[in-house]
Every structure is written in structure tokens, then in C-alpha cells.
Amino acid sequence: MTSYEMAKEKYAAWGVDTEKAMEQLKKVPVSLHCWQLDDVMGFDNDGALTGGIQTTGNYPGRAKTPEQLMADMEEAMKLMPGTAKLNIHASYAIFEEGEFADRDALEPKHFAKWVAFAKKHHMGIDFNPTFFSHEKVKNGLTLSSPDEETRKFWIEHGKACIRISEYFARETGMPCVMNIWTGDGFKDVPADRMGPRLRYKDSIEQILSEPYDKNLVKPCVESKVFGIGVESYTVGSAEFTLSFAAMHDGCMPLMDNGHYHPQEYVSDKIPAMLCFYPEFALHITRGVRWDSDHVLLLDDETKEMAKEIVRNQALDRVYMALDYFDASINRVSALATGFRSWQKALLMALCTPNEQLKELQDTNQLGRLMVMQEAVKMLPIGEVWEEYCRREGVTDDAHFYDAIEKYEKEVLVNRN
């Protein structure tokens, strides 16, 4: 009997079918963010990263061209079990020699190479308008700017992205989640908190007035508590985005678990959201004291978020995407590690006897519940994970970095 077969029997004694869990997991799409591989630089300008976000580190091997980025993503995907979607920002438009279009004039043709990449790997594509790192971010504002010319530019950018999102969905045959997030806000105490939000509301409404198939494009709005240089006031607050999505049919809220106060837990917010929203989106990251976007690991909050999605039968209601960027380590490793961590969290949740534990809570057997929750932590999930990786044709954790190291020595170090 193999170690997996013994683990399978132990789980069966708890009423858990590990075969069913693995079968479910491999079908769950998780969106894979391209910006980990190039430190959120993009291809449409050479300026510095702005928008209240920051990458730290200078590890060699950053992708500097579309070809390099796609090669790195392919290398990372070789190490990932399960189903991945591609997640790109508008700033990753790919232009032919001598060609350029500003963000308000982007067209589907500028993303044709991404579609070819996605089709090659049987992936869907999610999309993000890029409301940062651009000369037309005026005084830190885009969609909420009091300057109508500035605001109009960014509204047109959003509309262009709606059209591009529908192109992605039609080409790949999978819905495209289009996330609207801006870093709009103020460093110090504002004199008017409502005005920028009214302009922001109007701008998003204008973007969503662009005709699109609601079965193909899934717009969402993302909140944030603060960013670098916008510590005192963020236009797109949690209350704003939740209210906007609730009042606009077809628009979802998006929660990034790094975009809240450190003592707020998105795992607690997930079941609350499921009470009211048919669907919503999630950006999964790891914040250390703030929205630092560290590489996702199998930490407590990661596991708790996965639990809430799984035990509330919401795998088909929550659009899951990774969002972090670390320039201090091998970027291919960072991308693959985070993806594998979320797969582990989902697998653990799928291998939890959720109904048994719920029954103990509902019958007020809270002492027994605590003991059983602790006992579940000691079940042999590692053996199930290794079997899942084996079936998916990817390496186990013990040998995971060997492939990364080989790629670094053969490819990445030569880029500098």
C-alpha cells in the first residue's frame, strides 16, 4: 500500500473522499498574474511604477520583453498543477515595430499575441485597465479627477478595455473578468471627500455604458484602504465599491485581502458577501503589516479564505486571481510558489470534513469542535498533495526548486 493509499483511508474514516477532492480541484480556474515576472513595468512606457504600489528588490532576470515574459510564464506553468487563467494589465499591450497607441486608443489587435499564447495553453484571459504609471495621471487622480480632459482620457481607456475584454472572451471561449482599480486618493486630509467619489461613480458608469455581452465580460470594482502617497484618503473605498456593485447589475465587487486594515480578515468577509452577491472576485496576496504583496504562502489566512469558499460551495461563484510581486527572489519561483500555495489551500479545504464540523457547531458541541478542528490539521494532506502533483505531471515540493535553478542558470542570468 502506497503512502497515498494509506492517507486516502485515513481521510475516508472522516468521511472525506480524496479522489473527489483532487478531481474538483484540477477544474478550478485560478488567474495567474503576468506582472510578477517583470515587476509591474509593462510594455507601453519606460516610466517608474506609480499608483501607490511598489516592488522591492533587484534580483537578476526580470522579463523585459513580451517574449521573455511569456517564456518565463511557460516555465512557471510547468510547475503548477490545476487550471490557470492568464491575467494581464492594459499596460502589457504589444505593439509592432514603429507602432504605438495610447491607453485611450488601445484595440484588440494590440493583445493578439496574448490571445495566441492563451490559446496555445488552453487558457482564458482576465484583464485590467491600467490606471497608473502614465503621464496623464494628474495629481494622483484618474477617474475621479476634477480635470475633465484627464477624466475623459481615463474613461475612454476603460471603454477600450471593455471591448478588449469581450475580444478575449470570444477568442478563448471563457468569460473575461475585467477589474477596475485606481490608486486615486490624497496624501493628506482632503477638504472634499464626496466630490471625487461622485466623479468616480460617474466615470465607472460611463465605462460600463460601453455595450458588451454580460455573459462574456464580468466587470468588477476593487477597493483599497490606502497606498503609498495616498495614506489619508482613497476614493475607491470598501464602502464605495461594495455599494457600487450592489447598485449596478452585472458589476461585481472585488476584494484583495491586502487592501484592508491588517486586523480585517477577508476570510470573514467571504461568507458575508456570499449572502448578497451571486458572484464576486478575489485577489489573493500576502500582506506583511500593509499591502506589501509578498508571495502567497500557505499561511493561516490563506487557508481560511480557501475554507470559506469551499465549505460554502462557492467555487463556481468566486473568481480567484493571484496578485503579488516580489523582485527580491527568482520571479518564476515566486509566481509558481504562490500558485501552488493556493492550490494547497484549496486542497486542504476540499479534504476537510466540513459537514461534520458544522454539525458540531450547530449542536453547540464547541469543545468537541475545537478538538476535531485540531485533529483535522494533523491528517496526512501532504501525501494527497504529492499524489495530486504526480497526476498533474508536476514535480513535488522537494524537487521543485531544481527546475527553477536550472532555468535561472541557462536563461535568466544571461538577461543582464
List PLM regions with ranges.
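Acidic/histidine-rich catalytic cores of soluble enzymes
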Residues: 189-301
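Aromatic- and glycine-enriched pocket-lining scaffold segments that form the walls
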Residues: 169, 175-189
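Catalytic beta/alpha-barrel core
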Residues: 150-153, 257
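Short linear capping/connector segments at secondary-structure termini
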Residues: 183-185, 224, 324
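Alpha/beta catalytic barrel-like cores
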Residues: 1-146, 153, 162-164, 170, ...
